[in-house]
Amino acid sequence: MVNLNIKAMRYLSAEDFRTLTAVEMGSRNHEVVPTNMINQIAKIRGGSCTKSLSVLFMHKLIAKVPHISYEGYRLTYAGYDYLALKALSKRASVYSVGNQIGVGKESDVYVVGDQKGKQYILKIHRLGRISFRSVKNNRDYLRNRKTGSWQYLSRLAATKEFAFMKILHEHGFPVPAPIDHSRHCIIMEMIDAFPLRAVTDIRDPPALYQTLMDIIVRFARNGLIHGDFNEFNIIVREDGTAVVIDFPQMVSTSHPDAQFYFDRDVQCIVQYFEKNYQYKGDVPNFEDISKMEKENNLDIMIEASGFNKKQSKELEKYRQEEEKRKENGDDLSDNYEEEEEEKE
């Protein structure tokens, strides 16, 4: 897990952020960015980033990698967090960062506030958490990997989720209102609700079951399938109304495996209500829904908004690689940031 510690942010100078941005830019083509390249990109007066590099390294916003043939630095998760939060704070979307309220394999969730004290949710996507130490024992992993770097993948996931959330909200779906996003971070509406898995007393299970199935069907009639529709990604308000969250795995109904994803979403709800409430309701059929007239083609509208098929395929390829890795039993650590071998 990567801890979000923003205490150093207020003490970083404009030159420090310029240097950090230079490392980010160099990371597009280099896992470890040569120091001379950082100097060239940053273009700091005097020509040297030495002082800023020392400050950034001290705060673990960049890191050195041992056993390479040149001097250079890589961007850490913390460094990428700082760049995103700096951009969001400049746009007045974030003023303060509060408690962490969620952590997953691919994201961390925090409460944040704006200058007026209004609270929002900050979701930080963290795809591709890989330990260099583990990779040393799995040498073929990076060589054979077809997808991009962790920061690129995380940014893609955030871009996708924000695009889907925005268009769904605009069309009246029960999703959080999207506020802003930068790089791998999303700011969204904070909703007073609890995950379905944590709600032990649902007033009317049949009604909620039908509501959730109606949402799945409505997604499909608008050209979309959630792809991960389960008790972890549905939150329930005190009045019993449901809100859907978490959209990085959403796919079009034209996807080759659309029926598989649709049926999986449906069965997640069926099994949850059978297990927890001994209730079994009607089950929608993908073929029947496919024959209905579509309400909208939101999948096409999403692509027009900027998240295209190429990006979607890159994310899907990453997820397929991760599934294969799990099937092969590869044990790659999630702790990418704090390896003993990287300390000096």
Curated annotation (Swiss-Prot):
Comp. bias intervals (Basic and acidic residues): 311-329
GO CC annotation, single: nucleus
Function description: Required for the final endonucleolytic cleavage of 20S pre-rRNA at site D in the cytoplasm, converting it into the mature 18S rRNA. Involved in normal export of the pre-40S particles from the nucleus to the cytoplasm.
Matching InterPro entries: Kinase-like_dom_sf, Rio2, RIO2_wHTH_N, RIO_dom, RIO_kinase, RIO_kinase_CS, WH-like_DNA-bd_sf, WH_DNA-bd_sf
GO molecular function, one term: metal ion binding
Active site: 228
Acidic residues composition bias: residue spans: 330-344
Catalytic activity annotation: L-seryl-[protein] + ATP = O-phospho-L-seryl-[protein] + ADP + H(+); L-threonyl-[protein] + ATP = O-phospho-L-threonyl-[protein] + ADP + H(+)
Domain of life according to the entry: Eukaryota
Presence of the UniProt keyword Phosphoprotein in the record: yes
Cellular localisation: Cytoplasm; Nucleus
Cofactor: Mg(2+)
Listed Gene3D superfamilies: Phosphorylase Kinase, domain 1 (3.30.200.20), Transferase(Phosphotransferase) domain 1 (1.10.510.10), Winged helix-like DNA-binding domain superfamily/Winged helix DNA-binding domain (1.10.10.10)
Annotated Protein kinase domain residues: 95-250
Similarity comment: family membership: Belongs to the protein kinase superfamily. RIO-type Ser/Thr kinase family.
Assembly behavior: Component of a late pre-40S ribosomal particle.
Cited Pfam families: RIO1, Rio2_N
GO biological process: maturation of SSU-rRNA
Positions contributing to ATP binding: 123
Name the UniProt record assigns to this protein: Serine/threonine-protein kinase rio2
Membrane spanning stretches: none
Residue ranges, annotated region (Disordered): 311-344
PANTHER family in the record: SER/THR-PROTEIN KINASE RIO2, SERINE_THREONINE-PROTEIN KINASE RIO2
Keywords: ATP-binding, Cytoplasm, Kinase, Magnesium, Metal-binding, Nucleotide-binding, Nucleus, Phosphoprotein, Ribosome biogenesis, Serine/threonine-protein kinase, Transferase
Enzyme nomenclature, EC number: 2.7.11.1
Class in the EC hierarchy, top level: transferase
